[in-house]
Structure formats: C-alpha cells, structure tokens
Amino acid sequence: MGHKIHPNGLRLGITQEHRSRWYASSKTYPLLLQEDDRIRVFIQKKYGAAGISDVLIARKADQLEVELKTARPGVIVGRQGSGIEELRSGIQKTIGDRSRQVRINVVEIERVDADAHLLAEYIAQQLEKRVAFRRTIRMAVQRAQRAGVLGLKIQVGGRLNGAEIARSEWTREGRVPLHTLRAEIDYANKTANTTYGVLGIKVWVFKGEVLSKEEQPLPVGASPRRKGNRRPQQFEDRSNDGK
C-alpha cells in the first residue's frame, strides 16, 4: 500500500498537515474549495520565481489566512512590505470579494535543497534547458545530500534525451521507507515541457522519523525511569474532622 497511495495523503494527521484548514456546510464547501484552488494557481503564476514550496489556507469566520512557504521571501515581501499589499489585493480580486480580510504570512524555508517541491522544480528547469537527465539527477542528489537528508528517490519519465520510446528511470540514495507511517516523507511531482514532449518528475525525500514522547531518546548520562508498582495516590477531604 505504501507504494500505491500518495505519500502525503497517507500521512495526514501523523506527519503531514492539511493544506486547507476550515469547516463548511455541504452547500458552501465546493465554493470554498474552488476558491482555494484559484488562490494557489494565482500565487504560483505570479510568484513562480520566488521558489514557493507550499500554500496553506485557513479560514476563521470572515477572515482568510494564507501562509506561503518560500525559498526567497524577499521576492514576495518587496520593499517595505509593498509586495504584501499587492498580494493581498490580488487574492481579493481572485476570490471576487474586496471586503474580505486577508492575512498573509510568509515563511522562509531553512533547508532549500531538502524540500521535495524545490528539488523537483530545479530538475524541471534543468531538463527544460536540455541538460542530460542523468546529470541533472546526479546534481539534485548531491544537493540533497549536502542538505543532510536521510534518503532520496527521484523518478523521471517520458522521452528521455529525445528517445523514440518513452520510459521511466529512477534512482535512490539512502532510506525511503514508504510503509512507515511515522516517517517524514516529503513528496512532490512536477512536469517539464521539453522540445521532445512532456517529462514527469517525482521526488521523495526522507527527513527522519517522528517519535512520540515515550520514544524520545534519553539525554547522555540519564537513567531510565523505573516502572515499579507505585502505590496509587489518595486524596481525602478532612476539612470537617474535629467538628
């Protein structure tokens, strides 16, 4: 099952969070879902050069919150925050409601080369520049390894290097445990429009396992807590004694 299902959808609520966080009735749900899609398409088209990895949308009453995870926040923010106002007005125009309160939060990605979306975008850009796909994959693997990822898998499919018959090739470095639900797997897919046709790109990045509090490793020199038969605590109300 881990190889058949979407890695992010399988881990929602475990290691992945929902990209849209809001509740709605059955009548308004389709409308709000279409709004979210229009907002994401607008942001990706307008700020494609900003290296946007993800767009999270939350709704609270009449307020709309949009969080952008990007590698270059300065492209979005602009000088003295002028870009934020431009983005806010663009979102209001996209959803067709100028009076809607829109709150924008821009988050900078710390490890750019460990992000699956940005790696897939980098591979797509190189393939569109007619760089050999094996060299492109090797360069992407080296960048991810320098970023400290524990595992990486890259798959490219289509008319590779202009071949007459389409095929798929993939490479893997390290561990990519798709069956482990607590494994933090970052997944992304992109398309590259080349002169020979469309190439599909898939990237899996393994960043580690999310452990519960009981499974957290102990500090150096700390002894494990004994699990003996503890006497249960009892609390008695003696406020009325002696009366």
Swiss-Prot record:
What is its quaternary makeup?
A: Part of the 30S ribosomal subunit. Forms a tight complex with proteins S10 and S14.
* Xref: CDD domains: KH-II_30S_S3 (cd02412)
Q: Where's the KH type-2 domain?
A: 39-110
Region (Disordered) location: 216-243
Query: Could you tell me what this protein is called?
Result: Small ribosomal subunit protein uS3
What does the organism's lineage look like at the top?
A: Bacteria, Bacillati, Cyanobacteriota, Cyanophyceae, Synechococcales
* Keyword Transmembrane listed: no
- Family of this protein: Belongs to the universal ribosomal protein uS3 family.
Q: GO cellular-component terms in the record?
A: cytosolic small ribosomal subunit
Entry function: Binds the lower part of the 30S subunit head. Binds mRNA in the 70S ribosome, positioning it for translation.
Spans traversing the lipid bilayer = none
